[in-house]
Every structure is written in structure tokens, then in C-alpha cells.
Amino acid sequence: MQISYFQPKDTYINQVMMCFYNEKYYIYYQCDDTRLPQDAGGSQGWNLAVTEDLEHYEVHQMVLKSAAEVGRRKTLRAGNVVIREERFYACYSVQAGTDTQIVTAVSEDGIHWTVAVQQFVLPPECDDKFEAMPSLFYEKETKKWLLTVSAEKKGPEAAYRGCILQYQSGDFTTWIEREMLWSPMRYEKIERPAFFTIGKWQYLLYSEHCDEGKIHYRKRQKGETGWSAPRRGCLDGRCLEMGGVFSENGHWCLYGILPIRKMNSELGDWSDCGGVLVHRIVQQENGDLSVLPIEEKETQLSGVSALTLENIQGNAELVFAKQTGTRYRVDFMMEFSELTYRFGVKIYENSAIDSGYAYQFVPGEQKAEFDRLPNMKWFIYLNKGMAQSVSLIPGKKYPVTVLVQDDISVLYVDGVAISARMKEKPGDELKFYVESGKLAVSEITLDREAVK
């Protein structure tokens, strides 16, 4: 079982669209492979990678191109690709100067496309200069195609003008406005909106245009007009951005860009480029969503190994594995006692110099976070946005999964994920620790061959 991650050899990508068909992933990504990793947009079309395992793939060059007039500098913004009755349907937006076009395309095989520029009438309260970043969804109840786009209301440049519109069509050609889907007066811009349903619930996914750049979602029951915020509005942290959803064998998957750092530094800001990371979406009884690894653990082993750490006055830690390698999966159950201050698991740890990376849990703050430990001298790892709210209750057992693949790690706990990148490799140890309290770890399984 591997981290569900895709990155073409010798390049970074952004503006990705993804779907699943006939037991294969179809990944459409920006084709301008010569640009620097920190550059965004500017591509003239999309490459296609077809893969069964996200590791071995076949590339088709420039299968989707801009429909703007030849000779003008164009920027393509990602939309999505939907499978409907054995056909591929795609949408994306093209910017040429200040003009924006929404493009739709239809294909029998996902490689050869018929492309058309669509005409949309924006409501009078919206600015006619917008990035769109559309997404498609087929509503079975009404037999209508729904197209969701990002727009901006008219107003001062500094105002929170970002909004989301939705159009509908019965023939995939003529589009009429269905509703102003959301206008939260919260963001300057809203990017990559996506609309989808699970059972009686409707969901709105979007990326925020701000310093943390996370992927958020809102929910409502069918028939309702307003959106409600779930207990946790993000299913991953800062290291998953500009993504969407696709359907795989009856369930939904969340995907997005796992970015690299600018300036090749762990103090650098996050780039717009990287690789594609995928999570499996699970719906809770109250309509909230959670995420799990795409692949389940092949063998459900219990009681393989267990340990207890306790130090009321300070720190206690134990090296569980000394030679983990750079690709592995560890699953375990964790339980902590009341008044425990902090605990966690360290990866790429070097005990001799007390250096490594860690997923740590802070019960008093009800959060899990990724960090470099020790993060000094003041400081060496920028981890803003790399934390999640987690319900941490003393005496309760929590299943935890940590996946490591070279410079990438992903934590799954309590229905959320925290993805991260690690530029360095201080050591090769896997270590558990607790600070001012007691931690019991059980059913530990370490699979060094999980990622091939």
C-alpha cells in the first residue's frame, strides 16, 4: 500500500484534474514542464497520465488544448473531468489577458476531445472579470448538468467579493443561471469550487485564496438553501491545495496539489507546484466528512507490539524501529491519561543529535500538528497551517496511520489528515514519546514494504 501520490518524472505540476474510469486513474495536468516550480499557470494545454497505481503510468501529450485564439498568451485554470455513461466530460477556464472563457469538452476515450467555448451571462452584481475555475456535476434527479464557477461581486478591490455561482443545462450546450450558490463575504477570491452529493447531503468544496490556502467544504441537506459549517471545515492541512473530488467505485475521493517549498528551504513559502495527493472520503451520520487512505491495510493484525510511556514531570520516549528506510506504513492504537500535556510519533529521528520530524498531539488545545523537533534554532521549519482540530479524550483509544514516502508523510487520525513535506533526513528511527503524562500504544504494525 502506497501513499496515493502522483508526480511525473523530473517535473512538478499544478492545475490538475483527475477522474477514475475502468480501474484506472486519468490525471490531466499542466503541460508547461519547462517553467520554474514556483511559477503558476501559463500552460497551453493538458497532458494526460493514465495509471492503475499512481506509480507506473503512460503519458499522452497535450490531449486538451486552449480554445482561445492562436497567438495570444493564455492561462488555463483547472476544472474537472466527469465520467457519464461511458463518456468523458470536462470543463476548465482559459484566460487571455482580461478575458475569461469557460471551455467544455467531450471524449469517448479521455484522449481525443471535442472542445467548445461556452457562453455564460453573469448576474448584474458580479464583476465580468473572473477566473471561473469551473466544475461539472450531473444531477440524476433533475437529469441536468450543473456547472459551478468562481466569481467576484462588484465592489472595492480590497473588499471580500468572492462568491460561487451555479448554472444548469439539459443538453451540455445552453447554460442558464440556477442560483448564487454561496456568497460568504469572507474571501477576496474563492478558487476551485466543486459541488457534489452523497445521499441526502449536498457538499460545496473550495480553496481559499489566502496565506494558508487550504481546501474547505460546507454541507447542506437537499432542499435547503443555506450552507452550514461542519465541526472541522478542512479534511487536510496546508499541504493540500487547489483540488477537487472524483468518484471511484462508488465512493468519493479528495485530491489536490501537495506543494514543494520555494527557495528549496523549509523556511520558504509553499509553491503552487508539486505532485497530486489523494484521500478517500467517508461520510459520517451527521453529514460531516472524514478521510482515510485510498488503500486499506491488507492484514488486520492486533497485539503485534505494544508499549507504555510515562513521565509526569518531563519527557519519556522510546525508539520503536531503528532502520525504517524511507518508505513505510505504521498503524497503531493510542491512548493517553488525563492531564497528559503532549505526545506523538517521530519520523526520520536521530536520537544521537535529538533531531527529526514529528506528528504531535496536544490534548489541552485539542489539536494534532506536524513539526520539526526541536524546531530551533528559532526556527528551522515553517509549519503554519499544518495542524488539525482533533477530539482528544483521555482514556479513549484512537486508531492512527502514518505513511512515509521519501520526502512526503501523511497522518490519518480522527477522520482528518495532515500531509507534509520533509526536505532533510536527520535519521532513520521511528520513535514514540510523551511529555508530562502517560501514553499507551498498542497493536503496532510497521510495514517497511508498504510503499514500493
Question: For the regions a protein language model found, what residue spans apply to each?
Answer:
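Beta-rich carbohydrate-recognition and catalytic domains
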Residues: 1-133, 137-188, 197-237, 258-310, ...
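Repeated scaffold domains used in trafficking and secretory/extracellular systems
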Residues: 189-193, 239-243
